[in-house]
Amino acid sequence: NIVENALEQVRPIVAKSYRDYRNYKQDFVRMLDDVYKKSQAIMYVGDKENSNADSALVSTKRSLIFNQLNKELYQKFFLTTEEIQACRDGYIYIHDMSARRDTMNCCLFDVAHVLSGGFEMGNIWYNEPKTLDVAFDVIGDIVLSAASQQYGGFTVPSVDLILEPYAEKSYRRALAKYERLGVAADLAEKEALADVKKEFEQGFQGWEYKFNTVASSRGDYPFITVTAGTGTGQFARMASVAMLEVRRGGQGKTGHKKPVLFPKIVFLYDENLHGPGKPLEDVFEAGVACS
């Protein structure tokens, strides 16, 4: 290179700056070329690196192309030369490299606090749910929206305890309806409880459909987990058992039903609650049957 040699003889410092700038531009050309090649593969072949992302969807294709650019930028500006070489040689692997630049990884989301008193999301004010079925719908909206702002797992802890107060509201509403209709007290209570149980079953079924068919704005299906099993109240127990029974029954055509992927269910076992003769032994048995 004539210019580089001339600068080296006159001003070595300037020559070094010239080389660095030239290499910088060449690196960007290579980086964008790699992104373009990957984008062509995504558009016409697809990408199966992440089973949560269906590359047949247009929104997912866009997300995957953006992720490839993010990955290249992360390698360029956040990794050392030694780290990059170690990745290429297979000595280390950096998971979710495409998402590490601009957000957080994994979340234990406090849905109960968000619901309490209402909240704002997407410039719209959500009032606190007054019934169980509305609580299921609102929680589904919250989870998909919040999970889109991060990567990795998204966990909603103790859904049995979260849903318990809304089940109580639905129960009192149903009970009041039957009492207005002149139904006997014992029958009214029985029918109100049956209504709440049905709302639980439909709500958990709705989550299973929503979390496995509605992609997040990231273009993937968020890795959603829920925990349950420790609530000792009547409706908390009903929530845990209903969720496990819905999962056990599966989704799909009659005679061909199978369990869905999301949400993952984590049963919180406590020997003092779930052991033989303990108050939640029946909930534990439902968990065993589901597993």
Predicted features and spans:
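Conserved catalytic cores of very large enzyme subunits
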Residues: 20, 24-291
